[in-house]
């Protein structure tokens, strides 16, 4: 556990360097320009500065908040791109499964279904379908041809529903028989799975909005109270004292970390559904 925490801390500092952050994001199939990186940092630091002044924090404490956020900023960015990557993978799987079923119902040939499905796909899954087609068209060995050809797609996405569909398509391809009703059942299952997942994501997005709204409202009320107290000379001295400064720094730090932590937690539940 301790070793895992050390690795997480080292990775956090590793990603502070833009080139390392960019390389990680590129691994998910996206680009993140240095201009966007600087703009995001600037807006974040501006928000921290305004919040600090709003709560009458002294400059050293505001700088401390900025440095703390800088450490977490790359991880927040990476998690956002990772979520986009996982979301795209989910859409790829759903589109692939539905189109394979529709195509195979019209003509029960795997190679034909792959060719038709390919027309509606793009990105990584398109390349994998090409690989599967080539493996079927130019077999090295005839034994278990279709299972071997489709395995490259299964290994990439590791989806139980995909493997179940492939197993059934291979069975029909090799043995024939009635297949329409079973494919209809599989298709209904895929649609229900898709609807459940999208509904879950919608609920999580709503929860994320409520978290942001609650944080903003709490900070606004607390900040307004501080502004009112600052007009009193005696209370103004309290606001400049070390007890208030340290306590406010700690609370703002918690608020600052609460959003990315809750965001990451919700996203992890969405993609893991």
Predicted regions and their residues:
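Membrane-interfacial helix-loop-helix connectors in multipass membrane proteins
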Residues: 147, 154, 226-245
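Hydrophobic alpha-helical segments characteristic of transmembrane helices
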Residues: 2-20, 100-117, 160-200
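Single conserved hydrophobic/aromatic residue that forms the stacking wall/gate
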Residues: 265-273
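Alpha-helical transmembrane segments of multi-pass membrane transporters/translocases
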Residues: 217, 243-263
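Hydrophobic alpha-helical transmembrane segments
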Residues: 56-67, 238-250
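Membrane-interface, cytosolic juxtamembrane amphipathic helix immediately N-terminal to a transmembrane helix
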Residues: 10-47, 86, 180-217, 231-239
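Membrane-anchoring/interfacial helices and their immediately flanking loops
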Residues: 1-6, 136-170, 174, 181, ...
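Juxtamembrane/interface alpha-helical elements of multi-pass membrane proteins
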Residues: 60-148, 273
């Amino acid at each position: 556990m301790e070793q895992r925490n050390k690795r997480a801390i080292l990775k956090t500092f590793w990603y502070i360097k833009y080139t390392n952050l960019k390389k990680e994001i590129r691994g998910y199939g996206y680009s993140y320009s240095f201009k966007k990186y600087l703009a995001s940092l600037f807006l974040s630091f501006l928000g921290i500065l305004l919040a600090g002044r709003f709560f009458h924090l002294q400059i050293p404490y505001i700088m401390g908040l900025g440095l703390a956020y800088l450490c977490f900023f790359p991880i927040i960015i990476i998690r956002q791109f990772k979520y986009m990557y996982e979301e795209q993978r989910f859409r790829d799987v759903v589109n692939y499964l539905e189109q394979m079923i529709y195509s195979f119902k019209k003509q029960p040939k795997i190679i034909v279904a792959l060719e038709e499905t390919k027309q509606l796909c793009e990105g990584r899954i398109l390349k994998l379908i090409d690989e599967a087609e080539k493996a079927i068209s130019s077999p090295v060995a005839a034994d278990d041809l279709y299972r071997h050809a489709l395995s490259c797609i299964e290994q990439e996405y590791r989806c139980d529903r995909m493997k179940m569909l492939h197993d059934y398509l291979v069975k029909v391809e090799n043995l024939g028989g009635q297949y329409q009703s079973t494919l209809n059942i599989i298709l209904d299952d895929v649609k229900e799975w898709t609807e459940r997942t999208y509904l879950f994501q919608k609920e999580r997005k709503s929860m994320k909005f409520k978290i942001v709204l609650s944080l903003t409202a709490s900070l606004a009320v607390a900040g307004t109270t501080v502004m009112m107290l600052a007009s009193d000379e005696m209370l103004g001295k309290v606001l400049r004292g070390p007890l208030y400064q340290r306590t406010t720094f700690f609370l703002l730090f918690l608020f600052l970390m609460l959003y990315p932590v809750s965001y990451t937690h919700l996203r992890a539940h969405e993609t893991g559904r």
